[in-house]
Swiss-Prot record:
It comes from Neisseria gonorrhoeae (strain ATCC 700825 / FA 1090). This is Uridylate kinase. GO terms for cellular component: cytosol. It is found in: Cytoplasm. Coiled coil: none annotated. The gene is pyrH. Pathway: Pyrimidine metabolism; CTP biosynthesis via de novo pathway; UDP from UMP (UMPK route): step 1/1. The lineage of its organism: Bacteria, Pseudomonadati, Pseudomonadota, Betaproteobacteria, Neisseriales.
Amino acid sequence: MTQQIKYKRVLLKLSGESLMGSDPFGINHDTIVQTVGEIAEIVKMGVQVGIVVGGGNIFRGVSAQAGSMDRATADYMGMMATVMNALALKDAFETLGIKARVQSALSMQQIAETYARPKAIQYLEEGKVVIFAAGTGNPFFTTDTAAALRGAEMNCDVMLKATNVDGVYTADPKKDPSATRYETITFDEALNKNLKVMDATAFALCRERKLNIVVFGIAKQGSLKRVITGEDEGTLVHC
């Protein structure tokens, strides 16, 4: 029996840290295999998937800027870290027989295509996974903002923000055991309650473009598929 798909085209935001697993930094082999396996499952269901990946497992521009490094330089280094993660994801997809393409917002023609919206949309329509690397290509913008931007440009049905927590809570569940998860919440409610769904620029862009967000825990087996089929998984932030 074919399962009903709630979202046909999605933009998945993966943090670099989500690829570390239990390691202190870098890419954990078992973790990336599990993550890519979860994504491959929805690709085989016919879902078109674009991915924006962070680079915090390799280099965090904001942290470096707290020292003596110039912020723009640190951000460019962070962008290059996202390219490394994107290439690792592409390789993992192709190992599973899933066609994937890396498009970089910075020109790196020897290792990745330069971002081009029409080509990216074509790839999605062909069933290929498109991995968007190097953020927006500009310093001072987070990969959350890059995800919101690419999600809007690709005309995605939803933005899926994969985190280490299985949704948006009334308080930090690690600090407050009485915290409860929101099943759904509006953009305005999230703002009024000062819930940190993502950075303000990304949140504002999603709200303006009416691009709903689902926050969910990627490490929870089957969670991505449950989001796609409309089950109670994570938190839906909507207009």
